[in-house]
Swiss-Prot record:
Keywords: Hydrolase, Lipid degradation, Lipid metabolism. Residues 33-234 form the PNPLA domain. Signal peptide: none annotated. One of its GO terms (biological process) is lipid catabolic process. Gene3D superfamilies: Cytosolic phospholipase A2 catalytic domain. GO terms for molecular function: hydrolase activity. The gene is PLP9. The keyword Cell membrane does not apply. Residues 363-384 are annotated as: Disordered. Highly expressed in roots and at lower levels in flowers and siliques. Pfam families: Patatin. This is Probable inactive patatin-like protein 9. A motif (GXGXXG) lies at residues 37-42. The active site is at 221 (proton acceptor).
């Protein structure tokens, strides 16, 4: 009897899986949007997602189109993680709660509360940010009108947000895939954003616990290990056959990676040194964060060297120092094989416009729900 029940269960799951796979278009590339951490304003990413959404609406003729309609997964670190979560937070009907403009407006208007400065030390010279103020703002943002506090499962598209766990001395990646597998890997969205933003020199580590209380981590800024989360997103898609069954390699991917510019400190090399010639803690963090982003960009530049149009990286080239409009007018920077960087003839704005043409041509994202949401049969746990 036990063998018959197991066989029936397997047959049910197999049929559900076949039905699910039949809806997947194997010819369409899987679209990834990745947003870097770095800084407190996210000016490069903010300018980029505003232009991205504007172009999507312009080229589709749909004034209500959202960025999440044309991407299959969104990843973000630090301030980029907050923007990513805002873009995919589900309003309860399967639609995003925030447009790109809403998300950027939220970060801009709430910036002084998200990063409320307070001074510590005997002479009040040490600058830190108030974790309580950020937590209050984030918890309000990720709460629906009916009072429901959103978790990683409450996103209209897969979401990936990294942090660094001091308890295990290893990266910890929050994902919707993990949240769908088990409540032990499901976390409240506001806590995820708080965790990935806990820069060591400015915030205290943040203790985050899963919704069932079984998994916890002592989180600091994900930028220490994954400031540019693009590689993590690519790896996640390549190994997550449940949600992305048609992806066999980078040839099946279309990636837009949004940088956040060099940190304020790193933009002026001489300011990294104290008067005695030592580096400050915040300067070391800046160096690590910028280095991580550049290293990931070089790796992906090599991986996509035969199909460069499938990987677009938007980053400030450092030749101008202006606002959002100036950043979009800057000539783009591309990483060639072996770490060589070259200035392109296209501006960052033009590169986004060209990328949107490919997005629109491929149509709206139509990833079906995970099989585990259609069946009481739990798939084998294969990690996050």
């Amino acid at each position: 009897m036990e063998m018959d029940l197991s066989k029936v269960t397997l047959d049910i799951f197999t049929k559900l899986e076949q039905k699910w796979l039949s809806h997947c278009d194997s010819s369409r590339k899987t679209r990834i949007l990745s947003i870097d951490g770095g800084g407190t304003t996210g000016i490069v990413a903010a300018a980029s997602i505003l232009h991205l959404e504007h172009q999507i609406r312009l080229q589709t003729g749909d004034p209500h189109a959202h960025i999440s309609d044309f991407f299959d997964i969104v990843a973000g670190t630090g301030i980029g993680g907050i923007l990513a979560a805002l873009l995919v937070a589900d309003d309860g009907s399967g639609r995003p709660m925030f447009t790109a403009r809403d998300a950027v407006k939220f970060v801009a208007e709430k910036n002084s509360e998200l990063f409320e400065i307070r001074y510590t030390g005997v002479f009040r010279r040490n600058k830190r940010y108030s974790g309580k103020s950020m937590e209050r703002v984030l918890e309000t943002a990720f709460r629906r009108e009916d009072g429901k506090v959103l978790t990683m499962k409450d996103t209209c598209k897969p979401l990936l947000v990294p942090c660094y766990d001091l308890k295990t001395s290893a990266p910890f990646v929050f994902s919707r895939a993990g949240a769908s597998e088990s409540p032990s890997f499901d976390f409240e969205l506001w806590k995820v954003c708080r965790a990935t933003s806990a820069t060591p020199s400015l915030f205290k580590p943040f203790s985050v616990v899963s919704v069932d209380g079984k998994t916890s981590c002592s989180a600091v800024d994900g930028g220490l290990v994954m400031n540019n989360p693009t590689a993590a997103a690519v790896t996640h898609v390549l190994h997550n056959k449940r949600d992305f069954p048609s992806v066999n390699g980078v040839d099946d991917l279309l990636v837009l990676s949004l940088g956040n510019g060099p940190s304020t400190m790193s933009s002026s090399p001489g300011r990294k040194l104290r008067r005695n010639g030592d580096y400050s803690t915040s300067s070391v963090v800046d160096i690590v964060v910028d280095g991580v982003s550049d290293t990931v960009d070089q790796m992906l530049g090599n991986a996509f060297c035969w199909n460069r149009t499938d990987y677009v990286r938007i980053q400030a080239n450092g030749l101008t120092s202006g606002g959002a409009e100036e950043l979009l007018k800057e000539r783009g920077v591309e990483t060639a094989p072996f770490g060589v960087k070259r200035i392109l003839t296209e501006s960052n704005g033009e590169r986004i416009e060209g990328f949107v043409q490919r997005l629109v041509a491929s149509g709206k994202s139509s990833l079906p729900p995970s099989p585990c949401k259609e069946s009481a049969v739990n798939p084998l746990a294969d990690g996050r």
